[in-house]
Amino acid sequence: QGSWRATFTGYDAEYKTKGTHPIGGALALLWHAEAGPVFAATMNKYQLIEAPNMQGSTRKYLMGGTPRIELIEDGNVYTNLDDLNTDIVCHIDKNNYCFQVNTHLVDISQKSPSGGEVPVVVNYVYSEQGVRICVRHCPDRAYLVLPIIASPVETVEISSKAMRINRNNGVLNVKCEAGTVEVGPTDDDGRIFNPVPGFSFVPLRILPDSEDKKVLINIYFY
């Protein structure tokens, strides 16, 4: 829409090696004509499945670069990125492209956390102004992960409600309308680098901070 381009994954099949390609209604790519790439999907878990054509990572931290809902329990990671039982509904409303993703938090073996099935509804709205991501009720202990692509040489400003990146004579804004912004662990340069697709990013976590557990994010560039 306008200067924005995006790709969703709606796969319902797995590769032989589990936990590789994102599925589950993931936002696999977000790109802006002036700002360039904002999100670019990675393997869910970096594995050298084509070792001669891939490089290992020597950095301290390595995590996936795909936006997701995440819950960690007893060291196990549960996200929407491996859910084979996801439904995506799309409609157009006043020239806005609206996607509703009905998904679940599972591990790479399709198992739910100990408390049982964890359904999640994520809404995406694309307009000429930008992109809105909304989780009306984030499950207990879960949060939204937004790995924002940012070169280590770019100037980044982060608060509990926003992130700003000076880029290409403009500013990429990530504004948190509901929830609280935190930054996950990074290497010394303040970034996570993932060899596939080869981007550095800042791992934002958006935690619900209200009784209704709503998370709402607006992304725009000016």
What is each stretch, according to the model?
Residues Q1-E154, I158-N168:
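Extended polysaccharide-engagement surfaces of secreted carbohydrate-active enzymes
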Residues N168, K175-Y222:
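Beta-strand-rich recognition/accessory modules
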